[in-house]
UniProtKB/Swiss-Prot annotation:
GO terms for cellular component: cytosol. The gene is kdsB. NCBIfam families: kdsB, PRK05450.1-5. This is 3-deoxy-manno-octulosonate cytidylyltransferase. PANTHER family: 3-DEOXY-MANNO-OCTULOSONATE CYTIDYLYLTRANSFERASE, 3-DEOXY-MANNO-OCTULOSONATE CYTIDYLYLTRANSFERASE, MITOCHONDRIAL. The lineage of its organism: Bacteria, Pseudomonadati, Pseudomonadota, Gammaproteobacteria, Lysobacterales. GO terms for molecular function: 3-deoxy-manno-octulosonate cytidylyltransferase activity. Its EC number is 2.7.7.38. It comes from the Bacteria. It is found in: Cytoplasm. It catalyses: 3-deoxy-alpha-D-manno-oct-2-ulosonate + CTP = CMP-3-deoxy-beta-D-manno-octulosonate + diphosphate.
């Protein structure tokens, strides 16, 4: 396979009905269809060989089981993370260990197809156990917001660390002002899309959480603390924000309604 050969991949979408800030989030309507349907359409547009929604809720399953090209994996209700849910989905789907699985969040109705393909291609050609995407931080609010995860990476593009803190910490600039992004350096925010082989997904789900994951509440740190590589590429086009709150939902509805 040459470096220009597009990756063959499947997309798995974890979808939970319960949401503290936006109950029933996957079924909230954006335009004429539920949010989860928009997400499956983005995955199909990206060229995924298979698209699966992993859920433990019959209402979500009923909303999408009729969609062409979309499969439903009814998973257990006790999963503590989306990774655990996707590991069960992979077993239900019967994917072999080498299958490239893209983990696309169920609240990303506007995820660009190019970005979905990019993370699959990155896994294919990087040799890392996982791949993910990042985007430049262009404002101080995001840089200092703990809900916006930042990352640093090696010169070769592998993740060095993910944090809710602003990393790298610009000692001189931040000592005097924190209302802008320093001109010197590169600040990246993490985009929560992942690719991994189905076999590594099972290994990941079986690992116990590490100290760093528990402190930062960032699941990907489990992989790094265990010594595995995560390749990171800057997204080829912007990822619009996901839907987390009622205000986010209103903005998404306005976006779809706009001519």
């Amino acid at each position: 396979m040459t470096p220009t050969t597009p990756a063959d991949f499947v997309v798995a979408i974890p979808a939970r009905y319960a949401s503290t800030r936006l109950p029933g989030k996957p079924l909230q309507r954006i335009g004429d269809r539920p949010m989860i349907q928009h997400v499956t359409e983005r995955a199909l547009l990206a060229g995924a060989r298979e698209v699966w929604v992993a859920t433990d809720d019959a209402r979500i399953a009923a909303a999408i089981e009729h969609l062409p090209g979309v499969h439903v994996a009814m998973t257990g209700a006790a999963h503590l993370s989306g990774t655990d849910r996707l590991a069960e989905c992979a077993r239900i789907a019967g994917w072999d260990d080498q299958t490239c699985v893209v983990n696309l969040q169920g609240d990303e109705p506007f995820a660009p197809a190019a970005g979905i393909r990019a993370v699959a291609d990155l896994l294919q050609h990087s040799g890392a156990q996982m791949a993910t995407l990042a985007a430049p931080v262009d404002n101080a609010h995001d840089l200092f917001d703990p809900n916006v995860v930042k990352l640093v990476r090696t010169a070769g593009g592998d993740a060095l660390y993910f944090s809710r803190a602003p990393i790298p910490w610009h000692r001189d600039s931040f000592a005097s002002q924190r209302d802008s992004v320093p001109a010197e350096g590169q600040w990246l925010r993490h985009i929560g899309i992942y690719a991994y082989r189905a076999g590594f997904l099972q290994r990941f789900a079986a690992m116990p959480p590490g100290m760093l994951e528990r402190i930062e509440s960032l699941e990907q740190l489990r992989v790094m603390e265990a010594g595995y590589r995560i390749a990171v590429a800057v997204t080829p086009e912007p990822f619009p924000p996901g839907i987390d709150t009622p205000d986010d939902l209103v903005r998404a509805q306005v976006r779809v309604a706009s001519p």
